[in-house]
Amino acid sequence: MKSQEITKRWVDFFVNKGHTAVPSASLVSSDPSLLFTVAGMVPFIPYLTAREEPPYSRATSVQKCIRTGDIEEVGKTARHGTFFQMCGNFSFGDYFKEDAIKFAFELLTTSVDDGGYGLPAERLWVTVYEEDDEAKELWLKNTGIPAERIQRMGKADNYWSTGQPGPAGPCSEIYYDRGPAYGIEGGPLADETRYIEIWNLVFMQYQIENVRSKVDFDIVGELPQKNIDTGLGMERLAMILQGVENMYETDQVRPVIDKAAELSGREYTSAESPEDPHHTDDVRMRVVGDHIRSALMLIADGVAPSNEGRGYVLRRLIRRAVRAMRLLGVEKACLPDLLPASRDAMKGVYPVVETDFARISRIAYAEEKAFLRTIASGTARLEDAVAESKAAGVPLSGADAFALHDTYGFPIDLTLEMAEEAGLQVDEAGFRALMLEQRQRAQADAKGKKGGHADLSAYQELLGKGETVFTGYDELEGEAKVRGIVSGGRAVAHASTGDEIELVLNETPFYAEAGGQSADTGLITGDGFVVEVLDVQRPIKGLSVHKAIVREGEIGSDALVRAAVDRERRHAAEQAHTGTHIVHAALHQILGPEATQRGSYNKAGYLRFDFAWGEGLSTATRSEIEEVSNIAIRNNFRVDTKVMGLAEAKALGAMALFGENYGSEVRVVEIDGAWSRELCGGTHVSNTSLIGSLSLLGEQSVGSGNRRVEAFVGLDAFRHLAAERALVSELTELLKVPSGQLADRISSTLNKLKATEKELDRLRKEQLAAAAANLVGTAKDAAGVRVVAHDAGQVGGADDLRNLALDLRNRLGSEASTVAVAGVSNDRPVILIATNEAAREAGVKAGALVRLAAGILGGGGGGKDDVAQGGGTDAGKVSEALTAVVDAIAKR
């Protein structure tokens, strides 16, 4: 049974059971605490946790998910994949355990002809929470599965909670017995390779408090509304129904594996055991199949490669796939062959991967091209680092390996492999330590950005008192009541001068950072206190949290206050936000509708706008964007906002941020009607002339297939232009030319500088050649081998010595000859030895001689028999090292 048919049967079955079919949400989660949608229940969390009223009592979905926590296991097991589809059915206070169990058993065991999956009931095993006698009895009563195939497990395996106070409940999991060929008998408790989990039923029925860990908490009572949350792994079921060994061989992934095998000329054999000689290649092909599909789906949902967040995950997936292909022997660009194979396998379920393939492929191919350049430049840097480490006689440092990874994007496994080929070890422990340190810094930074508290219970308690009403569209100052004060993640009764707090009001004119617009700042005052608002965030939907510091007095958790936004700063932010919409419209007008928004940020006087585009913008194009934007500002276009249904907004052509999740009702911002029409919750000027002017700073790449423009607006734009005018004036004075001739004069000066550098390089080479000619006459016989041993003194670097040694070797002719030249560069001695073929036949090996000399110099080195390089720390022993080389040749 094909994957498309599996998902269709799922939806049809539950729709027939009274469920509403809900389309998959984007892989880009609307939950700010998640990078991606990681489970089928994520879009339903507000309903399952009773934060929002669900629009239906029963729902079903097939949700796209991404998880990369076990990325290193991909390809090695039958079950680990980064992209997967979770089939789910949900009940919000409607049916509970019995119907959930009956539905699951019915769908799994009903014959294929009657719309089910046709699994033999005798191959099904079930686990229940060890204390959930009710679930076991319901399985026995409704399915006929015997008691010996129902096993009990503890909280770690069969109890669901968020890890925070709130809803929780026991689980029941359904397993499929793959047969004795896959492991020992005894059910899931004995072997989860043979018995593979396919469906998890969560019975959300309890309220928990005092959470000490995921398995240590207090159950304080039953929920007034009991919910059902289930998830079936579509790929796992497909694996069973299609009779294949693992999820990678199902119909949505196998075509990519086959293409990888074709490109590499290797055979895919389904090898599972590391002892199998085909295992390594098969794992690499499975990695390619998995990662290419994940990359396809992420780009389709609006993610672009970058060095942080979601973009970094995408970049890593693409680069791991390309790296796996290189290890399979394919060094050319391979995504133009692999990505279409994945598109064709997925388009039946997700038509967007075909209709939007031009954009998807442009981004993916550009990322592969960039990575291939990275490998080329990283290889050169690695070779330098290897040479330096060899010269010093030490392993390649963890710092060097980390720099290659962090700066060049050079994979550590490639560093290890190439260093091993060069006969050099790598301080892998040092590299791992630096990687851990970087992750810890990133986690700390992310924690700070999200308010510093992973525990949202204090906010959820405050939300229980009511949502924060935002009044800032209509007023910048108003009366309000304090709903609560949070300090250190806990609610407090009051705060005094100097305390840093998070303040929640019943209503507020302060705009919370969202949609790319920075938060308002200002003052909250009352009887005897002054609080300065530094930032405003929404840690959970419906709650505005003012991050503030008490400047005077003491504020209580039920105080009456006056909230006043910094008007000048808000106006400057509104100038920037409306300016962002204008730039977006200008880009569409000049580049076309494919220049879609990928992100934005605006604050007082400044805007940044990221958009989909595959190449840099010319100076003329940038000038045109700036001109169109300023004409719109000068035309005094009216800016209007309207609230309407999402369908109506789309019908009007309102632009939305790709991959963003919107509610059923949206806010639309229009500039001169249809000239610019976007979904936006931010604040704006009332007409474009209030922006004053807009000055582009330039544009740059921000990842494959994406560009960024930056601009100043209003007074900041004037200041920017004034600074540029002053710079031009300074340059004209310095170079003694009119401003119109500046570019020509600077270009001429740079050309002269390049010519001078070229001449210096020519003279240096001539000096080396002259030195080589003079040194030929200094050759001495050492047991039948002519030897030139020369101390060059201070040198520019190892390249100078290499060029001198090779020139000398050529000048000495075919007679057995060896050249040893040494010098000091950056206070460290360097030695280079070159031998000709006759000398090598006479037993003279450059690598062995360099190790001898470098040992005397207090370091190490290595190389081949014909050319080798070394170095050390004791520059005072250069003469001794050269003498030792000559003696060794004479005594060989």
Curated annotation (Swiss-Prot):
Swiss-Prot/TrEMBL keywords: Aminoacyl-tRNA synthetase, ATP-binding, Cytoplasm, Ligase, Metal-binding, Nucleotide-binding, Protein biosynthesis, RNA-binding, tRNA-binding, Zinc
UniProt GO molecular function: alanine-tRNA ligase activity; aminoacyl-tRNA deacylase activity; ATP binding; tRNA binding; zinc ion binding
SMART domains hit by this protein: tRNA_SAD
Main location: cytoplasm
Localization of this protein: Cytoplasm
Cofactor binding description: Binds 1 zinc ion per subunit.
Cofactor entry: Zn(2+)
EC number: 6.1.1.7
Cited CDD domains: AlaRS_core
SUPFAM superfamilies per record: Class II aaRS and biotin synthetases, Putative anticodon-binding domain of alanyl-tRNA synthetase (AlaRS), ThrRS/AlaRS common domain, Translation proteins
Description of its domains: Consists of three domains; the N-terminal catalytic domain, the editing domain and the C-terminal C-Ala domain. The editing domain removes incorrectly charged amino acids, while the C-Ala domain, along with tRNA(Ala), serves as a bridge to cooperatively bring together the editing and aminoacylation centers thus stimulating deacylation of misacylated tRNAs.
Protein name: Alanine--tRNA ligase
Source species: Paenarthrobacter aurescens (strain TC1)
